[in-house]
Amino acid sequence: MHHRWLLLVACFWVLFMLMVASKLITLTMKDPEGYGNKQGPLTVLPETEKIAVAETTKLQIESQPTTNSLKDESYTVLLHKERTELLRSVCSNGSLRNLSHTAISKFVLDRIFVSDKHRILFCQTPKVGNTQWKKVLIVLNGAFSSIEEIPENVVHDHEKNGLPRLSSFSAQDVHERLNSYFKFFIVRDPFERLISAFKDKFVHNPRFEPWYKHDIAPAIIRKYRKDRRESRGGLQFQDFVRYLGDPNHRFLDLQFGDHIIHWVTYVELCAPCEIDYNVIGHHETLEDDAPYILREAGIEHLVSYPTIPPGITKYNKSKVENYFSKVSKRDIRRLYTRFERDFKLFGYKEPTFLF
C-alpha cells in the first residue's frame, strides 16, 4: 500500500514538471519584438474595411517620391532661384543699365497674354516653344477643352483664341495685374534663337506669312547685301546678321512693324528688369521647367504641357558654328553688342568660338 502511494505521488510530480516545461517553451517562442508590449484586443475588419486600408496603404507608398525625384525637385528649385538672383544682379548693375532696361511700353504689353481666371501673365518670346504655351493658356481660359482640339490657325489669331493682351486693359488694371499675377516667360540661347527665326521665316517661309519673303527679305537685301546686284537665292544669313547688328536697325524695324518680334531682344519684348517675373524658363531645360512652371502657377492639375520630342530643346553648338562660319568677325561682334544683354541677364555664355 505504501509503495502504491509513492508511485502515485511520483506520477503526479512528473505530470506537473511537464506542464511547467510546456509553459516555458511557449514563452520562449514568442516574437522578441513584442516583448514588454501590452497586447491589445484583436479586431477583425470587415472585408470592405480591409480593402480600404489596403488601398490607402498603396496610395501612401505610391505617393512617396523617390530619392532621385526629391533631388531633381530640389535642384530645379535651386536652379530657378539662381536664375532670378542673376537677373536681379544684372538689372541692378548701373554700368549695364542702358543694356538691360526698357520702358513698359505698349509694345511690351502687347506681348503679354492674360488669364484672369487663373491669375497668370505670359510674355510671348517667339522661337522658344511659345506656341505650346499659348495653347496651354487657351485651354485654361476655356476657349477649348483640350490642347488637341485647337486648330493651328487659331493659336495666333487673337480674335478667336480667347487670349486677351495686357495692353487691352486700363492703366490701373495693368498695374494691378503686374503686381499680383503669376508672371513668366521662356528664353533660349540668343544666337540659336536668331537662327531659328531665320530658318522659319525666310527659308521655310510658311504660306500664310508671305510678307517675310516678299516684303521684309527684299528690304534687308537692298540695304545690307554687299553686292546688291546679286539678289538670287533670297535672303542669306549674312544679310540678316548685318541688319540685326546695325546700330541703325530701327529704321527698318519701324517699316516691318510687329513682325520684328521674332528677332528683337528679350529685353525689348518682356522688360525683365522692370517687371518682376516669378519664373523665367529656359528652352534648353524645358522638360524640367514646364512642369515646374505649371506647379508654381498652381495649374498642374488642370493642364499639361504638350509632349516634347527627345533632343529638340538641346543647344546645338555645331549648328550655330556652321551658320556663323560665313559671317565676318566684325558683323558677329556688332550682333553680340546688341544681344549682349540677353546673354548676361539669363546666364548664357559669351560665344567665344565665334570671335
Curated annotation (Swiss-Prot):
EC number(s) on file: 2.8.2.-
Entry's Gene Ontology molecular function annotations: sulfotransferase activity
Any single Pfam family the record assigns to this protein: Sulfotransfer_2
UniProt KW keywords: Carbohydrate metabolism, Glycoprotein, Golgi apparatus, Membrane, Signal-anchor, Transferase, Transmembrane, Transmembrane helix
Keyword Transmembrane helix among UniProt keywords: yes
Keyword S-adenosyl-L-methionine among UniProt keywords: no
Main localisation: Golgi
GO cellular component, one term: Golgi membrane
Protein name: Carbohydrate sulfotransferase 10
Species for this entry: Xenopus laevis
Underlying gene: chst10
